[in-house]
C-alpha cells in the first residue's frame, strides 16, 4: 500500500468559530442546502464523534451515488476535524481510503486560516492520478466556498 500526502492552505474572512460551526458542527444539515448535488448526510453508526460512520448521498452524472465517511477526530476546542472516505462512489478503484485532516486557526483581521492535509492510501503501488487529485481539490474548494458564502450571507448564523 502506498500513501500519498497533499497539503493545502486557504484563508477566509470568517472567524474560526463561525466557520467551524458551518464546516463541522452543522455540516450534516447545511451541506445539502448549499450544494445542489448533495442530497443528504446521515449517521449510519455512532454518535457524531470519532468512529462515527456517515453516508453522504449525492448525484453525479445523473446517477444517485454515496460515499461512506468515517469520523477520525472531532476537536471543537482547537477547531480540528479529521475524517476518511472509506467506501462508496468517491473512491477510485486504486484507492483503499482517502483521509482528510483539517484545522482552522485565527487569521488576519479576525478571519481564519484553514489547513488541510489529504492522504491517499492506495492499493499496491498505485498512485492517484493528477485528474483524481485536481477533482478532489476542486470539490473541496467548492464545499469550503459554499459554506463560507452561507455564513457571510447569514450574519446571524
Swiss-Prot record:
GO terms for biological process: abscisic acid-activated signaling pathway; defense response. Induction: Not induced during nodulation. Up-regulated upon pathogen infection. One of its GO terms (molecular function) is abscisic acid binding. Keywords: Pathogenesis-related protein, Plant defense. InterPro entries: Bet_v_I/MLP, Bet_v_I_allergen, Plant_def-hormone_signal, START-like_dom_sf. The keyword Nucleotide-binding does not apply. Expressed in roots. Detected in nodules and leaves, but not in stems and flowers. GO terms for cellular component: cytoplasm; nucleus. This is Class-10 pathogenesis-related protein 1. It comes from Medicago truncatula (Barrel medic).
